[in-house]
Amino acid sequence: MPLIAVAVVVFLAERVQVKAAFHESPLLLAAFIMGMLALVPAHEFVHALAYLKSPFSRRLIVGAWPRHGMCYLLYDGPLPRWRVLLMVAAPFLVLSVAPMLALWSGVLAPRPAVRAMLLFAVLNHTALCMGDYCIVLWRILRNVPRGALIHNAGWTTYWGAKRL
């Protein structure tokens, strides 16, 4: 929640420029809304690519749990611990860290209003990644030994030693 609060503060700090930009270009408002809505599918797609398997594999399962307000993607098969850790971290690295570095470095230097919108989107995405970090990443780092295989079976995750 603190990141979402920071995002709102950043957005409100630039509200005059943002409002003017939306007024000047109504398509910018539509693009901003579509971009925010596209964050969840993009996040799950980056997870899919990070499994380093075909995104069209029958073992790749995409779903939603509306009651809990979450979407998920999992690979129904054993994977090495390092690959699961990569899969968990990938959306944060691609959709939060990379754009933030581009904003800070000046590589991505749009108008202040667009910059505020991008920062708002990045901070919101970072907040949305907390489920990945708090639930999955932390539990794997704490409980699964290096070199182990991890297998999701339904809502249960198992791990075991690699077979030689």
Task: Briefly describe each language-model feature range.
Residues M1-E14, R67-L164:
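Metalloprotease/metallohydrolase-associated module, dominated by Zn2+-dependent proteases
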Residues M1-G35, L52, G63-W65, P99:
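Active-site scaffold of zinc-dependent metalloenzymes
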Residues E24-P41, M117-L123:
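Membrane-embedded alpha-helical segments that form the functional core of polytopic membrane enzymes
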Residues S25, S54-S57, S96, S105:
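Generic serine detector
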Residues L39-P55, P91:
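Active-site recognition of the HExxH zinc-binding catalytic motif
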Residues V40-F45, P66-Y72:
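Hydrophobic, membrane-facing alpha-helical anchors
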Residues L49-G63, L137-I140:
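Membrane-water interface of transmembrane alpha-helices
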